[in-house]
């Protein structure tokens, strides 16, 4: 259900900074040779960055420093002003490779345990993407073409070679509905996602803000599911199977004008 997240301010800065500093002071080969098996695993999987201090002048670099771990990106802001993380937790659970299988609450708990040295329970989530897969008896692309709007905001249909999707944007969040069949081995699958960019959208459910600890509670996942269902129920779409010959003039007008979200 949870995929992408972004945390703007991580509490465990020292732990992440140690990895960044260690990886930058030595070459990759030197790092691999002088750390233990677990350290080698981390370095080989992920960590990469630029120079922090010019060894000739002693000047601090103003470049952001990045570390990549199974698809997650940790970023240190110049001058040590902040540390953030972003990426797909679903892909992380698959070694950073894919997110086309199921990602359950238990899978997330395993991810949280693996990341406990890097993300603190009190770290606040700034962006999160939640979604669910729906099996359909028809090609999902047909449903995408029937989408009209969500709360007055039109859906934009985007047709790419590897993905067909429809998006409706709001100030605090974005709804994305797309055909995931290509990623599911051809099985007819519709994906419904809500990407929350402003945590005010969660205010009624998480009045104190959404934290990493909240994500580790099953009741939070139940809340996400309810929000997804409510949001999807608010989507306005047209049913192309309606027989117009059996409609009254008033009903026919609704069909003809219904693709206008202002109507």
Please give the residue ranges for each predicted region.
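Structured, helix-rich domain cores that form ligand/interaction pockets
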Residues: 1-262
């Amino acid at each position: 259900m949870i995929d992408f997240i972004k945390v703007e301010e991580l509490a465990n800065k020292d732990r992440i900074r140690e990895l960044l500093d260690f990886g930058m002071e030595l070459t990759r080969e030197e790092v691999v040779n002088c750390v233990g098996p677990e350290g080698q695993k981390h370095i080989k999987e992920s960590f990469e960055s630029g120079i922090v201090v010019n060894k000739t002048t002693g000047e601090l670099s103003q470049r952001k420093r990045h570390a990549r771990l199974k698809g997650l990106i940790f970023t240190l802001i110049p001058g040590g002003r902040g540390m953030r993380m972003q990426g797909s937790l679903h892909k992380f659970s698959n070694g950073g490779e894919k997110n086309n299988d199921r990602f359950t609450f238990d899978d997330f708990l395993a991810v949280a345990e693996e990341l406990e040295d890097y993300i603190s329970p009190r770290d606040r989530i700034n962006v999160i993407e939640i979604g669910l897969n729906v099996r359909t008896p028809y090609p999902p692309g047909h449903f995408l073409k029937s989408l009209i709007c969500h709360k007055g905001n039109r859906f934009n249909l985007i047709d790419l070679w590897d993905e067909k999707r429809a998006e409706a944007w709001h100030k605090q969040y974005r709804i994305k509905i797309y055909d995931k069949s290509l990623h599911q081995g051809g099985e007819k699958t519709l994906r419904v996602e809500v990407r929350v960019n402003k945590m005010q959208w969660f205010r009624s459910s998480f009045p104190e803000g959404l934290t990493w600890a909240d994500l580790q509670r099953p009741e939070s996942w139940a809340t996400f599911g309810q929000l997804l269902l409510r949001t999807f129920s608010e989507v306005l779409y047209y049913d192309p199977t309606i027989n117009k010959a059996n409609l009254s003039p008033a009903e026919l007008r609704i069909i003809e004008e219904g693709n206008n979200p202002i109507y």
